[in-house]
Amino acid sequence: SQIRKNRLHFGLVFQSFNLFPQYSVIDNIMLAPRLAAKEQIKQTGEYMGAKNHKDAQKIIRETALSLLEKVGLSEKSESYPCNLSGGQQQRVAIARALALNPDVLCFDEPTSALDPELTGEVLNVIRSLKTSDSTMIVVTHEIEFARDVADKIIFMADGVIAEQGTPEQVINNPQNPRTQAFLSRFNH
């Protein structure tokens, strides 16, 4: 269906990681591409140039290993989520979201469930993704990170947009009283 096809264009990273505990890191990353490959080969006869499942699996594994390298976890490919720190689990979740090469990558408070010491490693990975061709939507309370990475900031209050603009406009010169009150709690 069209909805199913559209889902492949979005990568989602949640605050609680949502990794499958029974799967290794590499299998968590490869799961969605395996399902997509199976369906695409059935419909079109190929997946990323591969004409059969065996060749598709090689491509998917190479991609997953490359993504693990990108997030700094190459050595953890055969580990299980329970053996990873929260920051490592979140980086695996990011690699998993990237595995289908989405057009839009959505992050829901990607650091809120992490110890403060682990926040930096996850933010650095997200920061490195800014140069990719994907659009990123990041829900965050990490004001300095938002200032550094965002092209546009939307401040929401009570489920509606209170203010939007460049980081300079919204963070340094907020016009809305709700935005001003929120930002006054941070040293920026």
Name every feature range the model reports, one short phrase each:
Residues 105-108:
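Catalytic Walker B motif of ABC-type/P-loop ATPase nucleotide-binding domains
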Residues 1-11, 53-58, 131, 170-174:
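ABC ATPase NBD coupling module
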Residues 79, 100, 132:
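Conserved signature/switch motifs of ABC ATPase nucleotide-binding domains
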Residues 164-165:
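ABC ATPase "signature
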Residues 80-84, 88:
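Conserved ABC ATPase signature
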Residues 146-148:
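A short, surface-exposed alpha-helical micro-motif characterized by mixed small hydrophobic
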